[in-house]
Amino acid sequence: MENNNEYVVDKINHLINIAEDGKEGYENAAEEIKDSGVKGSFLLFAQDRLVYASQLREIVGQLHGEAEDKGGGSVGSLHRVWMDIKSTFTGGDADAIINTCITGEEAAIKEYKLVLDDDEIPESCKPLIGKQLNGIEQALASIKSHVHEKV
């Protein structure tokens, strides 16, 4: 049971890192983008990710595990670095920023689904993870709808 608990804590910590990286990515995107409507959405998405990380930390505590300090997940850090590079070279180009956010959300969705589908993750954890996944999917749909509105 101990090894399973460590495994679960590791997986939840991975989601915490993804949520924190998403928060940071959206804050960076909000700073760079000029469209006030999109900026407001990005700030709301950043706030959502802060809440997600906090909720996931509670799960880690309930499992008597230790939440990792901010370090970034492998998928999330790649997104964060890419966001930094993109904004530097694009000078705040809205399309490039939005496309980077789409890429980050698609990567987050993939990782959340892997954790949800993992039989080692306790059923008691899955409703919250599923709810967060739904929020990420809604954010992605919102971003994509903005792209389609511009066309």
PLM region descriptions:
Residues E2-K34, A96-E120:
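Alpha-helical bundle segments that constitute or directly flank the non-heme di-iron/ferroxidase center
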Residues V8-L15, S36-S54, I97-T100, S124-I136:
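Alpha-helical scaffold segments that form or flank carboxylate-/histidine-based iron centers
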Residues L15, G22, A29, Y52, ...:
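Amphipathic alpha-helices that form helix-helix packing interfaces
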Residues Y26-I33, V60-L63, F89, L116-D119, ...:
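Secondary-structure edge/capping motif, primarily at the C-terminal ends of alpha-helices
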Residues K39-V75, H146-K150:
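Conserved alpha-helical segments that form or flank metal/cofactor-binding pockets of metalloenzymes
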Residues E58-A96, T100-T103, A107-I109:
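Carboxylate-rich helix-loop segments that flank metal/cofactor sites and access channels
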Residues I97, C101-V151:
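Preference for long, well-ordered alpha-helical segments
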